[in-house]
């Protein structure tokens, strides 16, 4: 339900207040739905001048520059309550746009491997290759994963 809600309304997003409003309305709608559960949600609005992130839950958004330290853009988000609880507390922040790679990922990646391995994997290879390599970092020898792994890599 969260994805459908986002798809129906994403074109009107212009600033961090719009992003917060979307997540609040999504939370209220999912809370009223008898079938919908709770979910984490992380989104990034990238313009020519800035990156706006809005999130709730344990997914994260990182900026990985070509060199130097990575930046956790969702460091101030609330882990719980999640979207669909009716009590979610979304956080939205604005950052100047940097050169590098933007990573949006679930905790299935962020929790089960080190930041150093993630950053090293993202640097020096095309985004599609890096994305496949990132999923391999957390795969068990059996081929299973410890948790769901969803990620988006966006070169900036």
Q: For each predicted feature, which ranges?
A:
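PP2C/PPM-type serine/threonine phosphatase catalytic domain
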Residues: 1-156
């Amino acid at each position: 339900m969260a994805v459908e809600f986002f798809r129906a309304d994403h074109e009107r997003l212009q600033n961090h207040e719009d992003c917060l409003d979307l997540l609040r309305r999504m939370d209220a709608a999912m809370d009223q739905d008898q079938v919908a559960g709770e979910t984490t949600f992380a989104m990034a609005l990238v313009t020519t001048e800035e990156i706006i992130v809005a999130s709730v839950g344990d997914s994260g958004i990182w900026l990985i520059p070509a060199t130097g330290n990575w930046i956790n853009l969702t460091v101030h988000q609330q882990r719980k309550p999640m979207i669909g609880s009716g009590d979610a507390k979304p956080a939205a922040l604005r950052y100047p746009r940097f050169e590098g790679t933007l990573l949006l990922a679930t905790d299935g990646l962020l929790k089960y491997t080190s930041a150093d391995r993630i950053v090293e994997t993202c640097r020096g290879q095309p985004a599609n290759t890096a994305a496949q390599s990132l999923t391999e970092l957390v795969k068990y020898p059996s081929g299973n994963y410890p948790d769901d792994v969803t990620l988006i890599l966006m070169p900036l």
